[in-house]
Amino acid sequence: AYTAGIHTYNGIYGTLFSYPSLYRQHPMKNCSMPKYHGIYSTLRKNGYSTLFFTTHDAQFDNMEGFMKANDCERVVSDADYPSEEIKTTLGVPDDFMFRYSVPILNDYAAKGKPFIATLMTSSDHGPYYVPDYFQPKSDDDRNAVIEYADYSLSVFLKEARKQSWFKNTLFVFIADHGAIGYCVYDMQLSY
């Protein structure tokens, strides 16, 4: 199985804008940002509010610039979270971002408009961080992080289930990229 590439920008570009990874190209990094047609522009034209959440700095990979140039109305990042909740260079823990997102999504739902929201986690990226309040079964860092990521998703779904917008929401869970092993090229040659 293949993902959109081996970098976060490949996942955002491929998943939300339907473009494949291009060898040695970082499409989100350009100073002059071209307009791409993707799910955000299509849904925004049809009356949807468009949001993107990340646990960390929205300037990483120029995510905020790219998303806003391509019909994302609001990007929520570490600049929005209470500073005491930022635990690593990757910002807040995933479960905190999920909890933080629910009242914001409620505000958008209260406006009577449908919305699309992408919530990008970072718990499976180094430096690995598992909050003290979560006790994984595994002693292995990689497995503990997987357990924590699963827990974080369950926190979000339990909170979302209580909201009025839950019954009309399609939840799609995807990876922004595959696990990086030994890579000679940015993409597998068989791709």
Q: How does the language model describe each region?
A:
Residues 1-191:
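Solvent-exposed soluble domains appended to multi-pass membrane proteins
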